[in-house]
């Protein structure tokens, strides 16, 4: 494909309100962005791709009982970027993949099922001798509902199938690098030798810019799955439930545990050293029922998943909670907040907290996890869940009565936390003036009695700490004080429609006429109230998800 992009843009002036007003009470404004005239930029992108694919498929039923299937395929792909930098030799080299795959299936009376798949995939991203990887997969199923004793004892069961599978999948996209087994050598990055008494004579030299990884191989994901499929009461109830486990071995990542004697302190090599596992449950269920002229359909689905780090070449640490091994991928980490300091006496009696400013009453108090009397990075611990939801679910309802139709969809997440921060929650942290979150300033904040006139505002359990101007290293640190649940349940979609009778529409040569109303993102239930918890930045500066209302008229002739 080829893509030509022409951008024309100009910037208008941006002014910022200052801290003080003039003698007449008017805001003092300062220009922070100058106006720029219209300018034009052109960008060209594109690539060339070649595909070749050939396959052979064979299926046959023997003796009315043995169903056999055989499939084979060869696939080749080449992709060349056409807009690489003229000096980029690697960028000019095509990306090539070659794969052979096959499948064998067998079923006996559609009761006992077996399948074997294999793939032999080659990638030019690996050195000679390691370019191809073999990735097998096998699965088996037992449709127990096809047994005569089940049909006799439990006739209300339409289908009940037990299944299990195991397979391996390879990945050759390693950190986005081309030919990562090759070391890149050049004369850039200050590579030189110094000569002379004071080292003033410097001679250009070659330098390893990127260290290659010998014996690099495919990342391998081993996937396990056990599940059931079911259908009861002539299809009124149906669904599936699965338990899954994905174990990823030989993950391509940077080595972190290498002695300084190797001379690689500032550039440790990449290697197949990482291991992770993801496991969880997923399922869906549907219910269909007719009550008189009303037809109902209820459906629900969920996915629950956890991803743990098994190994990432870390150095041993006596503070076990400082390691990534054994914790979730992208685990949230921070200090444990113990409320707010009540007075100076409490500050003096507590473990020492360091900051870019003196610790004052109303500042956040932290737990000394390792007991050394000082609050520092050694007291940062894993906290809560990660930002990516561990639980996702949805519930839908459909109903129709005569010519009326109703559809409702709920969607939600759980098992996820996030830190709030930035210029919104930490008001005035950048020594700037402008929009701030009103809830952060006017809410339940710790306020000195000298300002409020009452000791009631010196509350160690207040929602917000002492308000300060400029950055506050103590209060702005990630901690349980700023950690919130990100779970929510949203009424994602509601649709109501009416189908006009065809006996009436045909008079106007219309076969179908539907009038409908659609509402999206109408309601949200969440413990976090300050802004929309779905997909927002830590400071809430994302544009919120809109509620939308629309009507439509659908006509078919």
Explain the meaning of each model-derived region.
Residues 1-10, 28-330, 474, 478-557:
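Extracellular/periplasmic, surface-exposed regions of secreted and cell-surface proteins
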Residues 18-31, 358:
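Charged, glycine/proline-rich intrinsically disordered loops and linkers
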Residues 22, 413-509, 513-514:
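Extracytoplasmic gating/loop element in the C-terminal half of outer-membrane beta-barrel translocons
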Residues 178, 183, 187, 192, ...:
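Conserved small-residue
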Residues 210-212, 379-383, 390-395:
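Glycine-rich, charged/polar anion/phosphate-binding loops
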Residues 386-421:
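Glycine-rich, aromatic-lined ligand/substrate-binding cores of catalytic
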